[in-house]
Amino acid sequence: MTPRYELAAPAERDLEDIFFEVKERHGLLVAERVYDNLLRTFDLLAQMPEMGRHRPELWPPPYRFWGTGPAFIAYRADVRPIRIVRIARASHNWSGFAPRG
Protein backbone atom coordinates (compact mmCIF):
# COMPACT_ATOMS: atom_id res chain seq x y z
CA MET A 1 0.00 0.00 0.00
CA THR A 2 1.32 3.43 -0.95
CA PRO A 3 1.69 5.85 1.95
CA ARG A 4 -0.77 8.73 1.90
CA TYR A 5 1.72 11.25 3.23
CA GLU A 6 5.39 11.46 4.02
CA LEU A 7 7.28 13.55 6.51
CA ALA A 8 10.36 15.46 5.39
CA ALA A 9 13.28 15.14 7.82
CA PRO A 10 12.71 18.64 9.28
CA ALA A 11 9.03 17.77 9.88
CA GLU A 12 10.04 14.56 11.67
CA ARG A 13 12.27 16.61 13.99
CA ASP A 14 9.51 19.18 14.47
CA LEU A 15 7.02 16.45 15.43
CA GLU A 16 9.46 14.99 17.94
CA ASP A 17 10.27 18.44 19.38
CA ILE A 18 6.57 19.27 19.77
CA PHE A 19 5.92 15.95 21.51
CA PHE A 20 8.71 16.45 24.05
CA GLU A 21 7.90 20.13 24.62
CA VAL A 22 4.23 19.34 25.32
CA LYS A 23 5.21 16.37 27.51
CA GLU A 24 7.52 18.56 29.58
CA ARG A 25 4.91 21.31 30.02
CA HIS A 26 1.67 19.32 30.25
CA GLY A 27 2.49 15.64 30.79
CA LEU A 28 2.54 12.44 28.76
CA LEU A 29 -1.21 12.09 28.21
CA VAL A 30 -1.53 15.56 26.69
CA ALA A 31 1.58 15.01 24.55
CA GLU A 32 0.13 11.75 23.21
CA ARG A 33 -3.16 13.50 22.43
CA VAL A 34 -1.40 16.28 20.52
CA TYR A 35 0.73 13.73 18.64
CA ASP A 36 -2.30 11.61 17.70
CA ASN A 37 -4.20 14.72 16.59
CA LEU A 38 -1.31 15.69 14.30
CA LEU A 39 -1.21 12.21 12.74
CA ARG A 40 -4.98 12.32 12.14
CA THR A 41 -4.57 15.75 10.57
CA PHE A 42 -1.86 14.42 8.23
CA ASP A 43 -4.31 11.70 7.14
CA LEU A 44 -7.05 14.29 6.60
CA LEU A 45 -4.73 16.47 4.51
CA ALA A 46 -3.80 13.42 2.44
CA GLN A 47 -7.51 12.76 1.79
CA MET A 48 -8.21 16.42 0.92
CA PRO A 49 -4.87 17.93 -0.13
CA GLU A 50 -6.37 21.18 -1.39
CA MET A 51 -7.81 21.90 2.07
CA GLY A 52 -4.86 24.04 3.17
CA ARG A 53 -4.27 27.59 2.02
CA HIS A 54 -1.43 29.09 0.07
CA ARG A 55 0.28 31.73 2.21
CA PRO A 56 2.62 33.56 -0.17
CA GLU A 57 3.52 36.02 2.58
CA LEU A 58 5.11 33.06 4.40
CA TRP A 59 6.28 30.76 1.59
CA PRO A 60 5.52 30.76 -2.12
CA PRO A 61 3.29 28.15 -3.77
CA PRO A 62 3.26 25.16 -4.00
CA TYR A 63 3.41 25.21 -0.18
CA ARG A 64 0.12 25.11 1.70
CA PHE A 65 -0.63 25.65 5.37
CA TRP A 66 -3.14 24.17 7.78
CA GLY A 67 -3.63 24.94 11.45
CA THR A 68 -4.71 22.35 13.99
CA GLY A 69 -4.86 23.09 17.70
CA PRO A 70 -1.60 24.75 18.70
CA ALA A 71 0.24 23.62 15.55
CA PHE A 72 0.64 24.94 12.02
CA ILE A 73 1.52 22.46 9.27
CA ALA A 74 3.36 23.37 6.05
CA TYR A 75 2.97 20.82 3.28
CA ARG A 76 3.07 20.24 -0.44
CA ALA A 77 -0.16 19.07 -2.06
CA ASP A 78 1.30 19.03 -5.58
CA VAL A 79 3.12 15.71 -5.01
CA ARG A 80 1.84 12.23 -4.14
CA PRO A 81 2.01 11.24 -1.45
CA ILE A 82 1.62 14.73 0.00
CA ARG A 83 4.76 15.89 1.76
CA ILE A 84 4.63 17.41 5.23
CA VAL A 85 7.63 19.74 5.27
CA ARG A 86 7.42 21.58 8.60
CA ILE A 87 5.29 21.63 11.76
CA ALA A 88 5.41 24.46 14.27
CA ARG A 89 3.45 26.03 17.04
CA ALA A 90 0.87 28.37 15.54
CA SER A 91 2.56 31.33 17.24
CA HIS A 92 5.95 30.53 15.69
CA ASN A 93 7.67 33.01 13.37
CA TRP A 94 7.78 31.18 10.02
CA SER A 95 10.30 33.56 8.45
CA GLY A 96 13.10 31.53 10.04
CA PHE A 97 11.91 28.26 8.50
CA ALA A 98 13.29 27.58 5.05
CA PRO A 99 10.93 25.44 2.94
CA ARG A 100 12.98 22.31 2.27
CA GLY A 101 11.22 19.41 0.64
Where do the PLM segments sit?
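Basic, Lys/Arg-enriched alpha-helical interface segments
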Residues: 1-59
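Short, P/G- and charge-enriched loop/turn segments at secondary-structure junctions
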Residues: 60-64
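Conserved strand-loop elements at the edges of beta-sheets that form or border functional pockets
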Residues: 9, 67-68
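Enriched for short, Lys/Arg-rich terminal
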Residues: 68-101
